[in-house]
């Protein structure tokens, strides 16, 4: 309960969160009014939400540059009316994703870590710059990281179908994973594990 209040307080008092708020507003406008996320109307709506007014400079413009299918992640959040509450929930989800990715990375590496060291590692995972900043800004990075780490663990354990699905889902943010994905898929093809490629391609096609 105390942790929940802290997250809610942080989401309300902190001026960040532009990445999440833009996509949340884009998703709401798209679902409720059929407004394209790439339109001027969507950009102005997000700007009013974030700045309280439309953008005064090009640097402030809230123009969507992500693939349309990436909005699927934000659809459940469109049910939340209050942007502060929506952002608080999203921050909690991202925090769980960071912790889960950290734990799975321990299994992936085969690191035999003592409980105290693990706790320190998990604390560091959340509160170092590259863990804490995406949580505060609301970036999708932690979720994509969790998908990639899970996919690599599935590859390690020879669950190729699951690995392919997870890699396909990681394309929610293509700029983050494209190089790694191409490398892994070529590795799979040349090592007789083509199902990784097929399931990744199929999942991406469904998106």
What is each of the regions a protein language model found here?
Residues 102-127, 162:
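Transmembrane-helix signature of polytopic, membrane-embedded enzymes
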Residues 179-204:
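Perimembrane helix-loop-helix junctions
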Residues 1-95, 102, 106:
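TM-lumen/periplasm interface segments of multi-pass membrane proteins
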Residues 161-175, 179-187:
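Membrane-interface alpha helices of multi-pass inner-membrane proteins
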């Amino acid at each position: 309960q105390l942790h929940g209040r802290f997250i809610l307080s942080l989401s309300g008092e902190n001026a960040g969160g532009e990445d999440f708020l833009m996509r949340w507003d884009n998703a709401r406008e798209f679902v409720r009014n059929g407004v394209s996320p790439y339109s001027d109307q969507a950009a102005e709506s997000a700007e009013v939400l974030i700045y309280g007014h439309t953008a005064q400079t090009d640097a402030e413009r809230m123009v969507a540059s992500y693939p349309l299918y990436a909005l699927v992640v934000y659809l459940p959040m469109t049910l939340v009316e209050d942007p502060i509450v929506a952002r608080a929930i999203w921050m909690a989800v991202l925090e769980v994703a960071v912790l889960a990715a950290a734990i799975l990375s321990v299994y992936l590496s085969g690191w035999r870590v003592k409980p105290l060291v693990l706790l320190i590692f998990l604390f560091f995972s959340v509160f170092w710059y590259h863990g804490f900043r995406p949580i505060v800004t609301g970036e999708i990075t932690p979720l994509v990281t969790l998908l990639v780490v899970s996919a690599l663990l599935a590859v390690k354990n020879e669950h190729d179908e699951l690995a392919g699905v997870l890699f396909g889902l990681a394309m929610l943010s293509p700029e983050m994973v494209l190089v790694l994905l191409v490398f892994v898929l070529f590795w799979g093809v040349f090592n007789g594990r083509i199902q990784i490629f097929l399931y990744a391609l199929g999942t991406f096609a469904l998106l």
